[in-house]
Regions:
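Phosphate-proximal small/polar/acidic motifs at interfaces that engage nucleotide phosphates
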Residues: 2-13, 18-82, 89-92, 96, ...
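Extracytoplasmic/periplasmic terminal helices and flexible tails
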Residues: 83-174, 180, 187-190, 365-366
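Internal, well-ordered alpha-helical scaffold/interface segments
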Residues: 180-183, 346
Length: 370
């Protein structure tokens, strides 16, 4: 049986351990609204037993506090980052799809349907009285209005494509900054933990940055214990290592040359992305996720095809839609709507011109002008 003072020491160890647990609980409650904070827990184990050369061999010395560790699930980290990438993807697709919808404005009195209906109303009115200068003027006025509508719509589409292009550049800059921060935190965490300290707060910061990084693309993390409190922390971004221990890779935006446009209606200077080490970056992967993929889908997506301008022997130009699932993503982005718009306008203009060249003049003679 332990003596009085030894018993008090055992009791005191329990009080100290309980006090540490209470303080840690208070710390957890205080940080309940802290973004990125991970709940902490006091790890305890039985104190080192003392041999007393008795039949029972040894006596316990109370409880010892081993560590204050984070209570975090790797499985839920992976699921969160997977879903965060999907969230980033669909948020961007929704934002820009709704913007295109406002341009088309089909349910407004001044949208496409209204312009189309007004044009053919004036055509029907002119059919009943072809010689009327007033009705001719009204039809020409509505034709001009339709042309202005399509020109404005095309300009809005091009401006949106350019805005998406700039957002891609901004996203790449943010991704590079986060990669640099993670590499720096890896070094700080290893420095502290190699000397026996606890780097829970720095680990929280690192996990928060990785969570934010997962918004842009698929992210996976692998932490491998090396020994003596040092670990090798690797982050992959869209299938390629972006952080390996204390080093990191970056993405670069490279403007396309004019003769390398994906679509005839694309604005100048659209960016492609590559890794700084020279490896290609593919934002069009079918099973990819993330806000960065959504931006490329919306900027370049043309329903597995692309728009090509053909010129015949007489110098006349026409549009051709070429099916090529390897060139552009399947999503119906800005180029798709531009392509449909161009086809509609080209067809409408051709039909009008054909009718005019086959029509009669005011004096009843056939039109001979081409």
């Amino acid at each position: 049986m332990p003596n009085t003072f030894f018993g008090m020491t055992i009791g005191a160890s329990g009080l100290f351990a309980s006090n540490a647990a209470i303080n840690t609980t208070a710390h957890n409650i205080s940080n309940i609204n802290t973004k990125g904070y991970t709940r902490q827990s006091v790890s305890q184990e039985a104190g080192f037993a003392i041999r007393v050369y008795k039949p029972y061999g040894a006596v316990g010395t109370g409880v010892a506090m081993v560590d204050i560790s984070q209570v975090r699930s790797q499985y839920y980290d992976e699921r969160y980052r997977h879903n965060n990438a999907q969230c980033g993807q669909y948020e961007n697709l929704q934002t820009y799809s709704e913007l295109v919808q406002t341009y088309l404005d089909e349910f407004n009195t001044e949208g496409f349907i209204a312009e189309y209906n007004n044009l053919f109303k004036t055509i029907d009115a002119l059919k009943s009285d072809p010689s009327s200068e007033v009705k001719r003027g009204q039809m020409l006025s509505h034709l001009s209005s339709v042309c202005n509508y399509f020109n404005t719509l095309s300009t809005n589409m091009q401006n949106t494509q350019n805005d998406i292009n700039e957002e891609i550049k901004s996203s790449v800059s943010s991704i590079n900054t986060m990669a640099e921060q993670i590499a720096s935190l890896n070094k700080q965490i290893n420095t502290i933990e190699a000397s026996g300290g606890s780097a829970n707060d720095l680990r929280d910061t690192r996990n928060l940055i990785v969570d934010q990084l997962s918004y842009y693309a698929d992210v996976t993390v692998n932490e491998r214990e090396i020994g003596n409190g040092v670990s090798d922390y690797t982050v992959t971004f869209n299938g390629q290592n972006i952080v390996t221990g204390y080093t990191y890779d970056t993405l670069q935006c490279v403007a396309r040359e004019t003769d390398k446009k994906r679509n005839a209606s694309d604005v100048e200077g659209l960016y492609d992305i590559k890794w700084s080490n020279g490896n290609p970056y593919n934002p069009y992967e079918e099973n990819g996720r993330g806000s960065l993929k959504a931006l490329f889908d919306m900027r370049d997506g043309c329903n597995d095809s692309y728009e090509k301008v053909k010129t015949d022997a007489n110098g006349n130009q026409s549009l051709e839609i070429v099916v090529d699932s390897y060139r552009n993503p399947s999503y119906k982005g800005i180029p798709y709507y531009q392509s449909q718009l161009n086809r509609f306008v080209t067809t409408l203009a051709k039909e009008f011109n054909d009718i005019i060249t086959k029509g009669q003049l005011a004096d009843g003679t056939m039109n001979t002008e081409k």
